[in-house]
Amino acid sequence: MWAGLLLRAACVALLLPGAPARGYTGRKPPGHFAAERRRLGPHVCLSGFGSGCCPGWAPSMGGGHCTLPLCSFGCGSGICIAPNVCSCQDGEQGATCPETHGPCGEYGCDLTCNHGGCQEVARVCPVGFSMTETAVGIRCTDIDECVTSSCEGHCVNTEGGFVCECGPGMQLSADRHSCQDTDECLGTPCQQRCKNSIGSYKCSCRTGFHLHGNRHSCVDVNECRRPLERRVCHHSCHNTVGSFLCTCRPGFRLRADRVSCEAFPKAVLAPSAILQPRQHPSKMLLLLPEAGRPALSPGHSPPSGAPGPPAGVRTTRLPSPTPRLPTSSPSAPVWLLSTLLATPVPTASLLGNLRPPSLLQGEVMGTPSSPRGPESPRLAAGPSPCWHLGAMHESRSRWTEPGCSQCWCEDGKVTCEKVRCEAACSHPIPSRDGGCCPSCTGCFHSGVVRAEGDVFSPPNENCTVCVCLAGNVSCISPECPSGPCQTPPQTDCCTCVPVRCYFHGRWYADGAVFSGGGDECTTCVCQNGEVECSFMPCPELACPREEWRLGPGQCCFTCQEPTPSTGCSLDDNGVEFPIGQIWSPGDPCELCICQADGSVSCKRTDCVDSCPHPIRIPGQCCPDCSAGCTYTGRIFYNNETFPSVLDPCLSCICLLGSVACSPVDCPITCTYPFHPDGECCPVCRDCNYEGRKVANGQVFTLDDEPCTRCTCQLGEVSCEKVPCQRACADPALLPGDCCSSCPDSLSPLEEKQGLSPHGNVAFSKAGRSLHGDTEAPVNCSSCPGPPTASPSRPVLHLLQLLLRTNLMKTQTLPTSPAGAHGPHSLALGLTATFPGEPGASPRLSPGPSTPPGAPTLPLASPGAPQPPPVTPERSFSASGAQIVSRWPPLPGTLLTEASALSMMDPSPSKTPITLLGPRVLSPTTSRLSTALAATTHPGPQQPPVGASRGEESTM
């Protein structure tokens, strides 16, 4: 009953109707109509209603240009080649072509009556219809021209004709059958480069740019953000639009490749105009403590009669010091003057400053020199200053001499050397204002000093742009597009060849108008490299059609002399409209009036073709671009996407009467997708792993790793090592196996019973489960719990709960050490949980010990059937120290007051076992136990043969 109620509730829940699905059609409310624009192309005339096709011409279905001639009276078996000009099968041309049938035609005549009488008119059908005999008479039925047409695109049959539609990127030719490629590049859809292809085009970018995700725009490539291993500059990189500039660190300069840097020489002298070597060695004066005792440098002796240096002054050669010479001469002043004059010193007034003020006042300078006599006072030792080129310098002082010499004084000795300049850039600025070394703060390029960061063009190179950065100048030149150009370039840096047209062996400039192929009645125009030809437009005639005459060699009709008329005749059937009658000839865009001279004047509301695939609404004059698109005979709403008919891997979208197609975007959400044959995108079901197809859910091994097992799950591959179970202490790995195995020394009994040499229980390949089923090797750290109680058996679950409340707690005795008991030392105890309850597990708990031969499982009550004996399957270890009993499955009726066995699942392989220790149950509990056993297993079970009470007591 409970199961039936649950099943009914599930069925009702499944059959309950859900909320109605709300589909989104994608249609948007119609917006404003696009503003009409003036029609362009040949055969366009202006009227009071705007611009439109001239009389005798109609817009083509593909491009919308006025290139489709109209023959008002039909051409019959001929073809309309010009307004009201038919080309007949016999080679003649005229306003119409004669029928080949008799006066009444193939299907007889109809009697037509009007104002003056009746006449027989041949039964004919309009163009695009055929006469068909039906049960109710002869009817005109539409002809499916698509069956026999030579349309290169998609043919759509219409009432009385057909429409040949070309795919995206193609346009219908003037013959209304063939499709020609549309050069989309003429509309400049690409920002930089455009390459036309059949039915499509491809945008590309110049070097230094990459294509944007919209496939039209170009984005600057920041070359300076590349990874370290792919960097473009050796040292520093500065990104520019479409390019980059490289600079070098101080001490390096840019090589000719403008990318790598090279080190300057370790020492580069200042410019030659500043640092010129002297032709004579430098001399300097050293002060002496005594006056009148000059010291000369080696190789320089005072000339005869020349005065020596002033008192307390000595001379020395640079850079090595010169020892003081103990010689003197009465002509020291003359010698000093000649020596100073021979030395290249920039100042000419040195003689007035030879002696410092301290010497002129008679002071004694503390310089390291020996006294002249014993009467001389001893001077305190200390650092001696230096007298150099008329100036006194303290010891350990430094100064720069004119000529870029660096000098320093060290204890009375002056040392000078050339200033060494480090060239840290490629275009340094020469030193100014007495400086010695060039500067890298700015650039000196082509004789002009540029400030830091200046962008300039070299002389006579206006198309080259240079930039000054840290004394380095980097220049780039613009890239000029190759091939012809649509418009003249805006700068003088690039030149291109203008677009021309090649037609019948001659070249024509863009926009040129010429006659085509010697036919004076055909006018051709060169537009954007393509030639478009059409018949020469003819002036509108003021006479009715019956008065048109085409003379020999003429391209247009002329009017003959008018004849008096009382109305306007429209066709050969004699239908006339009175003067002043206004009517619509079946076209909602055209209104006609019968004028007094018998001519018909029609005014047409010309429609502007603002889109290639508008929706034509019946009864409406102009097609509608704002409502959606008409494509391949179907109507699509704005922003509606649909697969292309010509290529299933293209996805098209309708946008205000235009259809744009692009490749299908394939989102890949897995690592190993598989690309089925004939599909546009890979799918994440099967896997493509290392070039081979792996079915979903298939488990396979790797060729180079046979011990690795992999699984394909919805495009993802997960691999793991083959798990191995250690069944013995000393495993051995055999060649070709993934897992180790036990050696052959293991006894057959141990291998069969699943016991290791250490006495532990292990299920081997020969082991059996509790129910006798063959099981695979297992090694579980914890055993899973039994299945939970099924809600479809609430009565059984209630009985189990009532029975549990009447049971005692489990009495457990500690297990004796291994080998302390014999074969009968293992007893059963009372478990605390039932199968189906949380925490229940089919385990054996040791109970209180019983004497040998005493029955462990007593009868439930007098007269109750005896429980069948239970015979355990014993397994002996190698040492025989421990006995492990494996119990066969017990029948469900053995639920007595002493023991109970609850099994929720009747299947032998999944039966959890709960053994209860001996206890005297109450009558109510006994009856519940009996009812529970009967409910679980209604059928009686026979006890196994050969079981003894003694074997049962060992439990």
From Swiss-Prot:
Q: Which GO terms describe its biological process?
A: cellular response to virus
Q: What is its main location?
A: secreted
Induction or repression? By HBxAg.
Q: What is this protein called?
A: von Willebrand factor C and EGF domain-containing protein
Ranges where the VWFC domain occurs: 384-441, 442-502, 503-560, 566-626, 627-685, 686-743
User: Does this UniProt record's set of keywords contain Signal?
Assistant: yes
CDD domains, sorted: EGF_CA
Q: Which PANTHER family match?
A: VON WILLEBRAND FACTOR C AND EGF DOMAIN-CONTAINING PROTEIN (PTHR47333:SF1)
The uppermost taxa in this organism's lineage are:
Eukaryota, Metazoa, Chordata, Craniata, Vertebrata
